[in-house]
Amino acid sequence: MKKSKLLISTIISLFVLTASSVNHAQEKDFDPEVAADAVLRSAGIDPDKSVANKAPASGFWTCHGIRMHMGVDMGSWTDLDTGELYTQIETGQIDEQDKDEKIKGTDYLYALTRNPAVIKYFIVDKSGKNLYIRDDVNIFKTYKCKRN
């Protein structure tokens, strides 16, 4: 999470640097690639290495009849039958003391990009390798997803 926030702030800094360097862009010795690398290196990020960390629960799944692909960083998922994209809007740890919750782990809430009123709830268990989808009507009922 820290790396993604750092990456976002670095990109914003890059845009600010680029905006302030518009006059310099006309010069032949200005290289935007070198400027971008310098900004990333000053933030402690090696631009030659990938910064995305693959979550164990990412990949292809079938959840209660929905064929889907969970994004590498769990930030989004795609319904493979309809092509619709859902993006993460909230995440949090499930309370260990909650007796209604049978599965303990991390709770994820996703909204459909073209209609944010359509939401889906997922749970990743403590091992990080098992994915569950919550029922749309009875929120305490969960279905285990199968890896494809």
From Swiss-Prot:
Residues 1-24 form the signal peptide. Keywords: Signal. It comes from the Viruses. Probably allows the phage to grow in a different host or environment or alteration of the cell wall or membrane. This is D108-specific protein. It comes from Escherichia phage D108.
